Amino acid sequence: MKVIKTLSIINFFIFVTFNIKNESKYSNTFINNAYNMSIRRSMEESKPPTGAVAGSGAGAGSGAGAVAGSGAGAVAGSGAGAVAGSGAGAVAGSGAGAVAGSGAVAGSGAGNGANPGADAERGPSTPATTTTTTTTNDAEASTSTSSENRNHNNAETNPKGKGEVQKPNQANKETQNNSNVQQDSQTKSNVPRTQDADTKSPTAQPEQAENSAPTAEQTESPELQSAPENKGTGQHGHMHGSRNNHPQNTSDSQKECTDGNKENCGAATSLLNNSSNIASINKFVVLISATLVLSFAIFI
């Protein structure tokens, strides 16, 4: 009987110590794991913002370099092409204008050669204005001389034979009407010449086509410039999105844990719950074993 009591007591102490050790091991491991997980999450929360900021800075630098390089290349190339083309177009236009034989037509030819798109939008109205300004001065000079000659002729010889001299106002009105008719005829004759000179000159057409090519390159170059910018912004948006996702989840889980909703907590709280459950089970087993040992010791 004494042996059984002693063995039961020894067994009780061994079992209690074993359970205490296991409980301490499980509790320590789960608590340590939970603590490590919380530390890792806190480190992850602190690291991704710094990494994202560094990545966004690198992305901004690469984007700026790409934009600067492509912009400089595109602007330099298009600028050189545009200057060369406009120079050649101006020479060709002035040559065609010289053949036509009027300074105003030479100016309009240079304008068409330098910027064919703007002159095509304007239409033939601008060269018409230049030609009318040059011809009106000549017409006024010619009408003044012709009116004086006609006045002298009318004073010397009267067509009616009655010795009456025509009034100078009537002569001036007639000469002005004639000058207006001449001006209209000159403007009508000059307008198609400028158009024909611009369209028929074989040298102006290929040079105008060459001039239109840099404009097409200029219109395409902003798209090329905007491409690396779009990439840069896409990278920034992705990084910021990935950065902002983690703290939101953690903040929600922290709010839910602080409110008392343990079902929606993170892995750290679940591990703590498991460790507490295991500790309670171990305590329950210890109590049962203690009662059994005491019962055997008492009744036996």
UniProtKB/Swiss-Prot annotation:
Residues 44-226 are annotated as: Polymorphic region. Residues 124-148 have a biased composition (Low complexity). Keywords: Cell membrane, Disulfide bond, Glycoprotein, GPI-anchor, Lipoprotein, Malaria, Membrane, Merozoite, Repeat, Signal. It is a lipid-anchor; GPI-anchor. Residues 111-261 are annotated as: Disordered. The N-terminal region appears to be involved in lipid binding. May play a role in the merozoite attachment to the erythrocyte. This is Merozoite surface protein 2. It comes from Plasmodium falciparum (isolate mad71 / Papua New Guinea). The gene is MSP2.
